[in-house]
């Protein structure tokens, strides 16, 4: 599936002038296929650069003047493709980007980004070692990590920038527990390691609950102030940051020195629907089939036609990120109308009932998620039918399908 994404997304700019492109995988093939290969795409994503820009601008309008924005581009920009979106990030003057993997960091740097690059999860020593040339600011939450990175810094002859993670937000995955004397001692030891330069202190909140955030924010402020005093860190040299998309917008006092928006930029923040999704998931009709009443459809014969029916075969299945559980529940859009998925979704095929839809022909566009004419398939609809949260869907889409970037 990566092969498919590489071929199509590399060639789209040469054949469709209204699109710009970036390859879906981070390690891409430079060979350009012919136009016929583009037409062989069974499913694809359309990413709206205009909506991405609009979401960024709207988000920026709610930030304090002195609050820096660090755009979180982990999971290859939430499945939307780092390489395709970085030109917009740069044009918008975003000073910081957050990533998870070295491949993502390299894609950011190769886009021409010269700003601050932060890893937003704990990394192994081998990851950190192989990323020294990328100038990543690492997230440190244990004494051992600090020792390992300090030794790496010494060997490389560099002073490495780090952000200390505290567990005051209650996430329990990266940070130091500051409620114990042992935890406080560990934090001071990290902050005073030679060859490491502490440039930030952070935490992360696990819930969409403003009152809970405010209570934990107070604890973070107390912990970070204590740590800076004990480790002789200068306040003006430390970036304090705790706010993800939800917190930045709904608890403005938590914006502090920097915010870390992720989902909101891509249109995935359930509490703030005023930020539309930038992605659509599409396929096309591959064939039409006329079945008589009482015909069964799909594996396990879970659907039986109640009338003479016209069924459309769609060349997309769970291997492309359209889950098996969509069967007999979900709907898709064809000719601006809803068509019910019948039978369970197969690995590479989905069947929909188009008996009541006029003018359906092979090759016509089908919207699996997104809008078509006056109809739309919403996030909540996808989640309910798939029995998955939306990020589990779109991150899989991004690894399984070519991306077309629409102005």
From Swiss-Prot:
**What molecular functions are annotated in GO for this chain?**
alanine racemase activity; arginine racemase activity; lysine racemase activity; methionine racemase activity; ornithine racemase activity; pyridoxal phosphate binding; serine racemase activity
Q: Which domain of life is it from?
A: Bacteria
Natural source organism: Vibrio cholerae serotype O1 (strain ATCC 39315 / El Tor Inaba N16961)
**Identification of the protein by name:** Broad specificity amino-acid racemase
List keywords of the entry alphabetically. Disulfide bond, Isomerase, Periplasm, Pyridoxal phosphate, Signal
Q: What class of enzyme is it?
A: isomerase
| Locations listed in the record | Periplasm
User: What the protein does?
Assistant: Amino-acid racemase able to utilize a broad range of substrates. Reversibly racemizes ten of the 19 natural chiral amino acids known, including both non-beta-branched aliphatic amino acids (Ala, Leu, Met, Ser, Cys, Gln and Asn) and positively charged amino acids (His, Lys and Arg). Among these substrates, is the most efficient with lysine and arginine. Is also able to catalyze the racemization of several amino acids that are not typically incorporated into proteins such as ornithine and norleucine.
Residues at the site labelled Specificity determinant that enlarges the space within the active site of Bsr compared to Alr, allowing the accomodation of a wider range of substrates? 391
Q: Which PROSITE patterns match?
A: ALANINE_RACEMASE
- The signal peptide annotation in the UniProt record is 1-23
Give a GO cellular-component term.
cytosol
Where, by residue number, does substrate bind?
173, 347
Q: Which family does it belong to?
A: Belongs to the alanine racemase family. Bsr subfamily.
Residue ranges of coiled coil: none
User: Which Gene3D superfamilies did the record assign?
Assistant: Alanine racemase (3.20.20.10), Lyase, Ornithine Decarboxylase, Chain A, domain 1 (2.40.37.10)
Per its Swiss-Prot or TrEMBL entry, what cofactor is needed? pyridoxal 5'-phosphate
InterPro entries hit by this protein: Ala_racemase, Ala_racemase/Decarboxylase_C, Ala_racemase_C, Ala_racemase_N, Ala_racemase_pyridoxalP-BS, PLP-binding_barrel, Racemase_Bsr/Lyr
The observed outcome of changing residue 169 to A is:
Completely abolishes or highly reduces the catalytic activity towards all the amino acids except Gln and Arg
Q: Does the keyword Secreted apply?
A: no
Name the predominant localization: periplasm
